[in-house]
Amino acid sequence: MKNIKQLLDYAYTNPNAAIKYTASNMSLWIDSDAAYLVAPKSRSRVAGYYYLSDTPKQPIQANPSFNAPVLVECKILRFVQSSSTEAEIGGLFHNMKTALPLRETLAELGHPQLLTPVKTDNATAHKFAHDDIKHARSKHMDMRYYWVKDKET
């Protein structure tokens, strides 16, 4: 009932709301974010915004033409994170795993995927994913986050 009320409130407040999709090459893009220690029991929240745009150029442009999202993912991480960087890497891990079936579906529909650009707003998490950080200082991070490095896009 609460969700229905929220939807009706949104529809009343935004009577001219629209979702806009423009023609693109159907390449999947991800915008990943995390909020550190904002949920109960010292947990962190992650969000993923998955949208389709043109094929990325090299180097990947910072601001592609945005379409409305094909998927928006919000979740609370199960484990307590020890830093904002670890929360961001947890968000990258979750969002990149969520993108795998989307990439496969797009490929099966005739839109092969090259790189899937993933944007994060944390410089340390970006450096960690691109192997530009000293490993001795990142040992506190769980081994499952090394998956992000293996799947680096």
Residues covered by each model-derived region:
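A short acidic-Thr-Gly-centered motif at the start of a beta-strand
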Residues: N16-M26, A107-H111
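Short acidic, Gly/Ser-rich segments with clustered Asp/Glu that frequently serve as metal-coordination loops
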Residues: A34-R43, G48, T124-H126
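Beta-strand segments within the central parallel beta-sheet cores of soluble alpha/beta enzyme folds
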Residues: K2, K20, L115-K119
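Residues immediately flanking
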Residues: S32-A34, D54, T120-N122
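A short, polar/acidic, helix/strand-boundary loop motif
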Residues: D54-G90
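C-terminal reverse transcriptase regions that engage the nucleic-acid substrate
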Residues: M1-N16
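Two-metal-ion RNase H-like nuclease active-site motif
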Residues: Y21, M26-K41
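RNase H-like nuclease module associated with reverse transcription
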Residues: R78-T153
